[in-house]
Structures are given as structure tokens and as C-alpha cells.
Swiss-Prot record:
Phosphorylated at both its N- and C-terminal regions. It comes from Homo sapiens. Residues 1-20 form the signal peptide. This protein strongly inhibits papain and ficin, partially inhibits stem bromelain and bovine cathepsin C, but does not inhibit porcine cathepsin B or clostripain. Papain is inhibited non-competitively. It is found in: Secreted. Belongs to the cystatin family. Expressed in submandibular and sublingual saliva but not in parotid saliva (at protein level). Expressed in saliva, tears, urine and seminal fluid. GO terms for cellular component: cytoplasm; extracellular exosome; extracellular space; vesicle. This is Cystatin-S. One of its GO terms (biological process) is negative regulation of proteolysis. Disulfide bonds join C94-C104, C118-C138. Pfam families: Cystatin. SMART domains: CY (SM00043). The record marks G32 as: Reactive site.
Length: 141
């Protein structure tokens, strides 16, 4: 009787030690949690590009806008991926009908820059090749 009890106690002590050593904050991953996204990640870049594309479709401005700076990028995985972006957007010198809009220079004159701070939420289901703009909010910077 003592031997099974000792084995059980040893197993529990080993498990407790393993849990304690892996419970550091940086090692915790909570399913459905929101985490900082890697801006170098191809999927994150696709979602950001989609957000800016949808933003440009919705604006009545003839000039194309693109990110000046990504202030924050986060992601959440559950039944797909939610991406959350906080972006400073600037007005370029290119009209929306021009090719290669991603390399357009920004307006230098302050009255033409029209900078905005925008928050975008993108939902993607990669295995269905589906992406949608869930929420978009912008204000003058």
C-alpha cells in the first residue's frame, strides 16, 4: 500500500514542479487571448494591406492613403484569426487610379497631409480564404 502512495506522491510532485517552472508569464498562452502580432509575419501584413485597401475603397478622397506608422498590432485566434491594428495613416500624392500605390510618396504640405489615426479589426478564416473588415474607426491626427 505504501509503494503506490509513494509513486503517486512522486508523480504529483514532478507534475507540480513542471507546472511551476512553465508558469512564467512569457510562457503562458491562453486560448482566445489577444497577443502582440509580429509585423514581419506574412499573414499579419496581408491583413494590414486588406484593412488599408478597404479603408481606401470607403473614403471619397481621390488620393490614396497608406500607413505612416503602425502603432500597435495584435491578434487573437479562435475559429479564425482576429487582427487589431492601430495605424497612423497619411495621404499620398497618388490618386487611387494609379498603379503601384504602395510606394507613393506622402504629401509634404501640412494642409494636404490629412493624417488620421485609425483602428481596424480584421477577421480572417485562412482555410476558407475569407477575410473581412469587422470594424474601422478613424479620426484626424
Amino acid at each position: 500500500m505504501a509503494r503506490p502512495l509513494c509513486t503517486l506522491l512522486l508523480l504529483m510532485a514532478t507534475l507540480a514542479g513542471a507546472l511551476a517552472s512553465s508558469s512564467k508569464e512569457e510562457n503562458r498562452i491562453i486560448p482566445g487571448g489577444i497577443y502582440d502580432a509580429d509585423l514581419n509575419d506574412e499573414w499579419v501584413q496581408r491583413a494590414l494591406h486588406f484593412a488599408i485597401s478597404e479603408y481606401n475603397k470607403a473614403t471619397e478622397d481621390e488620393y490614396y492613403r497608406r500607413p505612416l506608422q503602425v502603432l500597435r498590432a495584435r491578434e487573437q485566434t479562435f475559429g479564425g484569426v482576429n487582427y487589431f491594428f492601430d495605424v497612423e495613416v497619411g495621404r499620398t500624392i497618388c490618386t487611387k487610379s494609379q498603379p503601384n500605390l504602395d510606394t507613393c510618396a506622402f504629401h509634404e504640405q501640412p494642409e494636404l497631409q490629412k493624417k488620421q489615426l485609425c483602428s481596424f479589426e480584421i477577421y480572417e478564416v485562412p482555410w476558407e480564404d475569407r477575410m473581412s473588415l469587422v470594424n474601422s474607426r478613424c479620426q484626424e491626427a
